[in-house]
Curated annotation (Swiss-Prot):
This is Kunitz-type trypsin inhibitor KTI1. One of its GO terms (molecular function) is serine-type endopeptidase inhibitor activity. The gene is KTI1. InterPro entries: Kunitz_inhibitor_STI-like_sf, Prot_inh_Kunz-lg. The keyword Signal applies. It comes from Glycine max (Soybean).
Length: 203
């Protein structure tokens, strides 16, 4: 029993140490050139204009509640604010920090009250899609990686816990038969984004 506890503690420490901030750690910057706050809320907006707007949720397939993470078809729509949180005890988020992502508050029908808001990867029918789900999820975490040193352009990646060589996959867009722009794992076709501070419309 003691050996099992010791091994578990060893894994936690090893994971934490591997992500400790270093002198070369690069903070993820928003559109104001400010570093993203750990636990802060931001809009995630596409760099390429004319191909959709911010990130929101929708119902796909036989879903009654909006459980599929999608890109708004309206390029003027900023979508829903996203909360980015790292388990590391850091004030700001740096590139490649392990992250959980969830939606801030948004209105749903009464039937869907209490539905999950945290992002997860769900694999069904050969497609690994970003969903709001508590079951049938792939264990792992999200990262933010920079794609341009000249601009504050980034991509999201997902790193499966069981992946060989810590291989992570890009988050991209797949347009389904209904024209819905779904966020999915995509090989070498990332959705390139920028992060804008969330400001409530009632503020």
């Amino acid at each position: 029993m003691k050996s099992t506890i010791f091994f578990a503690l060893f894994l936690v420490c090893a994971f934490t140490i591997s992500y400790l901030p270093s002198a070369t750690a690069q903070f993820v910057l928003d559109t104001d050139d400010d570093p993203l706050q750990n636990g802060g809320t931001y809009y995630m907006l596409p760099v390429m204009r004319g191909k959709g707007g911010g990130i929101e949720v929708d119902s796909t397939g036989k879903e009654i509640c909006p459980l599929t993470v999608v890109q708004s078809p309206n390029e003027l729509d900023k979508g829903i604010g996203l909360v980015f949180t790292s388990p590391l005890h850091a004030l700001f988020i740096a590139e490649r920090y392990p992250l959980s992502i969830k939606f801030g508050s948004f209105a749903v029908i009464t039937l869907c009250a209490g539905m999950p808001t945290e992002w997860a990867i769900v694999e069904r029918e050969g497609l690994q899609a970003v969903k709001l789900a508590a079951r049938d999820t792939v264990d792992g975490w999200f990262n933010i990686e920079r794609v341009s040193r000249e601009y504050n352009d980034y991509k999201l990646v997902f790193c499966p816990q069981q992946a060989e060589d810590n291989k992570c996959e890009d988050i991209g867009i797949q347009i389904d038969d209904d024209g819905i722009r779904r966020l999915v794992l995509s090989k070498n076709k990332p959705l390139v984004v920028q992060f804008q501070k969330f400001r409530s419309s009632t503020a």
